[in-house]
């Protein structure tokens, strides 16, 4: 079957501290993993993730750092022409959340006013350290937030759906078919996830704390 022409395609910049699960997350999408390309000059892997919506196909070219962030900052070439972003932290590691403002600053410095989703990964791990009430950065900066678990596929599609709606400018856009995902490596405790969702809802209703140095 011939590929439809002119599939809307967006550059998605995936950032966050090393070890937060960014590569694990992007590799869940099997066709994207199969079709990825390596850009040697920047040391990045670009994964084309296709999603089928009620308005046709959409593609995110997800730029993954391939671990460079562990060696220091990322070069501007990584961010240039980024049309949307995902900032990832690890809910079992407070320092990765504390560093979110630095990643956000880098993103908006180069990409300016793009839609960004903040994702707290590894919610399948029982020892959660970054609790819902501590996650306020997205509210201060008008980002979307999702708890995710890359290894279990929990909420995998949510960040992409939110970004697609923003980029296309249509809140009624829906994904009509699930992409082929790698089988879950871990199981999530549904009761625990329901509790987390409840805590997020309650936290969202609370007034924001005063600005503190950690979020500057």
Swiss-Prot record:
CDD domains: Ran. Residues 6-170 form the Small GTPase Ran-type domain. Keywords: GTP-binding, Nucleotide-binding, Nucleus, Phosphoprotein, Protein transport, Transport. One of its GO terms (molecular function) is GTPase activity. GO terms for biological process: poly(A)+ mRNA export from nucleus; protein import into nucleus; ribosomal subunit export from nucleus. Pfam families: Ras. SMART domains: RAB, RAN, RAS, RHO. One of its GO terms (cellular component) is cytoplasm. Residues 36-44 are annotated as: Switch-I. Signal peptide: none annotated. The modification Phosphothreonine is found at residue 20. GTP binds at residues 17-24, 67, 121-124, 149-151. It is found in: Nucleus. Residues 67-83 are annotated as: Switch-II. Oligomer of dis3, pim1 and spi1. Found in a nuclear export complex with RanGTP, exportin and pre-miRNA. Interacts with fft3. GTP-binding protein involved in nucleocytoplasmic transport. Required for the import of protein into the nucleus and also for RNA export. Belongs to the small GTPase superfamily. Ran family. This is GTP-binding nuclear protein spi1. The lineage of its organism: Eukaryota, Fungi, Dikarya, Ascomycota, Taphrinomycotina. The gene is spi1.
């Amino acid at each position: 079957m011939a590929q439809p022409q002119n599939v809307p395609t967006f550059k998605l910049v995936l950032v966050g501290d090393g070890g937060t699960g960014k590569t694990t997350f992007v590799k869940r999408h099997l066709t994207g993993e199969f079709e990825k390309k390596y850009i040697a000059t920047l040391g990045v892997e670009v994964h084309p993730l296709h999603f089928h919506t009620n308005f046709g196909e959409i593609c995110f070219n997800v730029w993954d750092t391939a671990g460079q962030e562990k060696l220091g900052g990322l070069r501007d070439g990584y961010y240039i022409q980024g049309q949307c972003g995902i900032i990832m932290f690890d809910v079992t590691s407070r320092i990765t959340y504390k560093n979110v403002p630095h990643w956000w600053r880098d993103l908006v410095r180069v990409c300016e006013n793009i839609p960004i989703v903040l994702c707290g990964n590894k919610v399948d791990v029982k020892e959660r350290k970054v609790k819902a009430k501590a996650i306020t950065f997205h509210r201060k900066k008008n980002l979307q937030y999702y708890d995710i678990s890359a290894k279990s596929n929990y909420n995998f599609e949510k960040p992409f759906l939110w970004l697609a709606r923003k980029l296309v400018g249509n809140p009624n856009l829906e994904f009509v078919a699930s992409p082929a995902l790698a089988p879950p490596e871990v199981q999530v405790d549904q009761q625990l996830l329901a509790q987390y969702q409840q805590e997020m809802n309650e936290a969202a209703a609370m007034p924001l704390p005063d600005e503190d140095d950690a979020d500057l």
